[in-house]
Amino acid sequence: MAFTQKTIIRNVSPMDVVRCFHSHKFIEFLTLGQPVKIESWKGIDNNKEASFSFWFFGWRKMSVVHENYILNREYLSFEDKGLILPFGLQGWTHRHIVKPYESGALIIDQIHLEE
């Protein structure tokens, strides 16, 4: 199963968005008010891992490793590959892309699940 979401951020440079992706405080901000616990987060560079728990009729654990990190002046791309997955999932790949768009930035999330 595949899912793609695109988010346009106006009047913000792509590099400002990229800096946010590298900030642990930004990750905490994204999960604020959600039933999510960040267990560990090492960063988004290649081979760095992240693990967290989220509430869905009980706490569920998920762990990923980051791969295929690409960064240049106005572009970022990296993937989360599932290590520990909930709900019997066999595979999880989440590709993050940040690139210029009109007077701002475009964030593209491409998620592929294997059941």
Task: Identify what each model region corresponds to.
Residues K25-F29, I38-P86:
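Glycine-rich portal/gate segments that line the openings of hydrophobic small-molecule binding cavities
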Residues M1-K6, Y75, G91-T93, L106-I108:
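Intrinsic-disorder/low-complexity, polar/charged segments enriched in Ser/Thr/Lys/Arg/Asp/Glu/Gln
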Residues I8-S13, W55-F57, K99, H112-E114:
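Solvent-exposed residues in well-ordered beta-strands and their adjoining turns
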Residues Q34, M62, S103:
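Residue-level signal for beta-strand positions within conserved beta-sheet cores that form or flank
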Residues G82-E115:
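Beta-strand/loop substructures that line and gate deep hydrophobic ligand-binding cavities in soluble
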Residues N11-M15, G43, N68-Y75, I97-I108:
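A short, structured loop/turn motif at beta-sheet edges
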Residues M1-K48:
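Hydrophobic ligand-binding cavity/cleft-lining segments
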Residues Q5-T7, M62-I70, T93-P100, I111:
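Hydrophobic/aromatic beta-strand elements that line small-molecule binding cavities or substrate pockets
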